[in-house]
Amino acid sequence: MASTGSQASDKNKIFGFFNDGEPPTKKPRKLLPSLKTKKPRELVLVIGTGISAAVAPQVPALKSWKGLIQALLDAAIDFDLLEDEESKKFQKCLHEDKNLVHVAHDLIQKLSPRTSNVRSTFFKDCLYEVFDDLESKMEDSGKQLLQSVLHLMENGALVLTTNFDNLLELYAADQGKQLESLDLTDEKKVLEWAQEKRKLSVLHIHGVYTNPSGIVLHPAGYQNVLRNTEVMREIQKLYENKSFLFLGCGWTVDDTTFQALFLEAVKHKSDLEHFMLVRRGDVDEFKKLRENMLDKGIKVISYGNDYADLPEYFKRLTCEISTRGRSAGMAREGQLNGSSAAHGEIRGCST
């Protein structure tokens, strides 16, 4: 019985957040058995805009595509990069909810005019203005989410994101850990990531703002990867053989980039098991999402009724998964090296 108490104590101490001795105000949501029994190395974490918005809620550009385009447009106007008529045209398109990918593409082209063989870098300036000083804008509950992601990463999970920001990399650096940002322009590194040779790398499938030339909004922008059969085979094997865990993603599976990379080759697979954590919110919308995702092998799981429920839920899930993964690893090690290895500390689940 003593070991059970010790395990519970370890789990409660996992990251140091929400460990003030206060009893929980409501009964925590149960963890789905088929998810909590996964090991970190069996997971690919997919980070969507919902995570970035939770980490730095005061930055409108992190909340949605529309928010990002508006922020870029505002920066372009502030820097006198657009004529009045041009800015009005872009504002009108945003207001009318025109195709946002096309609007973003046109704005990027406008901010990156090519003269002879030289392309200006005004787009880069606008990006840096939009994402300026993200470190100071992170909130504690958001940092807890990033800490959970980083913990799973260090224990073998792969991470990809649809976001342009580098919040996870910034948080890791603050913890004294170095993560690499990858985009689809570097086929060699993408291949190595898919082969699990670059586990401490974050794959940004739309690019990352620190490398504007790697930003792509449509599959046409990374034909080099789509035409590389070796890279595509390794990428799609991940979706077939691992469990993707979607965090803050909503309708990410409708993203044309994500579909081209992962879904095209596995449309008719029936043995996929992926997971999506979402807020329950509107019951009808939740049911609709759950039904739609099941067709793609994705189980939609509610972490609670409020966005604020996610950090604590994901912390518990992370510790459960890490504990099982670490225990299995130490059991194997113990068989080889004697029983003492099996009694080592589970890193991250104790102080």
Swiss-Prot record:
The modification N6-acetyllysine is found at K11. It is found in: Nucleus, Cajal body. The modification Phosphoserine is found at S9. The modification N-acetylalanine is found at A2. One of its GO terms (molecular function) is identical protein binding. It comes from the Eukaryota. One of its GO terms (cellular component) is Cajal body. The keyword Kinase does not apply. InterPro entries: FAM118 (IPR038916). Coiled coil: none annotated. Keywords: Acetylation, Nucleus, Phosphoprotein. The keyword Nucleus applies. Residues 1-32, 330-351 are annotated as: Disordered. Belongs to the FAM118 family. May play a role in Cajal bodies formation. This is Protein FAM118B. The gene is Fam118b.
